[in-house]
Regions:
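Right-handed beta-helix
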Residues: 1-2
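Short "domain-exit" segments at the C-terminal end of structured domains
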Residues: 445-460
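Membrane-proximal intracellular helices of multi-pass ion channels
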Residues: 7-444, 458
Length: 460
């Protein structure tokens, strides 16, 4: 009984505290108590589940995957309740879409006039992304000692890949340290943004930048903001796309630690090359052709943040849009809050392909796969290739479903790549200055015709 109950406990623990904070904001603005009631319901559910599973001490492999899935499902359902009961969303489907987009930090929205919504709803959107950014699973790992449960398997599943590592001997201490960095960077960004933005806008953008989420309190995202705000957000998007374990090593060894990390050099190099390639093909009179806006948009796509500093879907020639489309698949560093395949996996696959080419010429050669000074085990390479194949396969499947729902090919490919990579804005019907309400209308029509489609995702 305890082992069965632990899945629900880990998925729901802490949600009551989240609702309590949101209820205060909502009460101040609306003089309403509906979120206080929701917080009470959350506590009434969490406490009995915790009591039933308090003696469980470990996870089986099956439990690990169930907890991962339940964490996102439960968080999305709970996250949609304030949206729905606010009366500002026309249907529960719209509320659930916005909540899933927030928790998974995808940043896709069905709202066409964000600025008309009350601050409590805008804060809740931002806070959902902040909670989802480093992973609800990591948040629960930090709380697992209260349950007496080991969280190592959860941590390894939530942050897989060649670059995953424990930065402290005990996994719960690692999770807590990651959270401290996460909170610290969020507060630092808020402080810097508050010099040029209103208090509320500064805190919301700080909450959505560090998780590389992209929800904004402005209708045009970051497009109308000044150079200072764009520069600060650009810096923290790069920080959010960096391996958090690397931040810890730099704290101990100094700034040169960044330069010693091979993946970080690839990361910065890719940003520079992509930005220069786009600038080289741009016309000086074209909107968004300046260095800051171009670099901002490259980083926003690569890190899956999804902010828009310009309408990149109107860029010409088309090769510039195609380059951004490719960056949607790559993603930033492993161990970061970004989406996509992750740069470290791409590097590992390229090195493996090169090694296999050499082996075809020298059949007896022993060629280890190295990234920096580290040799990547064959088992990790196999898992990396398997992940890559699954990712690409699901991209084509998702594209097919979007086409079946009535989208043109450009919109379908863009929406699938954006959804898989947790980016948000895309191309075509879901362009940089558009929203996803048409996607819900297509899905609703398909449901009426008996076609059930479940589209969702979480950064990996």
């Amino acid at each position: 009984q305890a082992e069965d109950g632990i899945r629900d406990s880990v998925a729901s623990r802490g949600l009551g505290d989240v609702y309590k904070r949101q209820a205060l904001i909502d009460f101040i603005e609306f003089k309403s108590t509906y979120l206080l009631k929701i917080a009470g319901i959350s506590f009434s559910v969490c406490i009995p589940v915790w009591y039933l599973c308090r003696k469980a001490t470990s996870f089986s492999n099956k439990d690990v995957f169930l907890v991962i899935v339940l964490s996102w499902v439960v968080a999305s359902i709970f996250g949609s309740i304030p949206f729905y009961y606010s009366g500002l969303f026309t249907s529960y489907t719209n509320a659930l879409f916005e909540a899933v987009s927030g928790v998974t930090t995808t940043g896709a929205t069905i709202l066409s006039d964000v600025e008309s919504f009350p601050k409590s709803i805008l804060f809740w959107r931002a806070f959902l992304q902040w909670i989802g950014g480093l992973g609800i699973v990591v948040f629960t790992i930090a709380l697992l000692p209260l349950l007496g449960v080991s969280g190592e398997k959860l941590f390894n599943v939530e942050y897989p890949g060649p670059s995953s590592e424990k930065i402290t001997p005990r996994i719960k201490d690692t999770a807590r340290l990651l959270l401290s960095f996460y909170v610290g960077f969020t507060f630092l960004e808020f402080t810097l943004l508050s010099y040029s933005m209103p208090f509320f806008d500064a805190i919301c953008h700080a909450l959505t930048t560090m998780p590389t989420g992209g929800f904004s309190t402005f209708n045009d995202s970051i497009n109308s903001q000044g150079m200072y705000v764009k520069s600060i957000i650009l810096l923290f998007m790069i920080i959010g796309g960096t391996n958090f374990a690397l931040h810890f090593r730099v704290l101990k060894a100094g700034p040169r630690g960044y330069l010693r990390d091979r993946e970080f050099l690839y990361y910065i190099g890719l940003i520079a090359l992509a930005s220069m390639a786009i600038l080289f093909t741009s016309n000086w009179y074209e909107e968004g052709s300046n260095t800051l806006d171009t670099t901002f948009q490259v980083v926003a796509i690569l890190t899956s943040t999804g902010y828009t500093a310009t309408d990149y879907s109107a860029w010409q020639p088309f090769i510039k849009q195609f380059l951004l489309f490719g960056l949607m698949f790559v993603g930033a560093m492993g161990g970061s809050t970004s989406g996509g395949i992750k740069l470290i996996r791409i590097v590992a696959i390229v090195k493996y392909a090169r090694a296999e080419l050499k082996r075809s010429l020298h059949s007896k050669a022993i060629i280890p796969i190295r990234i920096g000074q580290k040799i990547i085990p064959d088992e990790v390479i196999r898992k990396t290739i398997a992940f890559f194949l699954f990712y690409v396969s699901f991209f084509f499947i998702a594209s097919f479903f979007f086409v079946m729902l009535g989208d043109d090919l450009q919109s379908a490919l863009g929406a699938a790549a954006s959804g898989m990579g947790n980016i948000g804005p895309s191309w075509g019907s879901y362009g940089a200055m558009d929203n996803y309400i048409s996607c819900l209308l297509y899905t609703s029509d398909a449901a009426d015709e008996g076609l059930g489609v479940d589209l969702g995702g979480r950064r990996i």
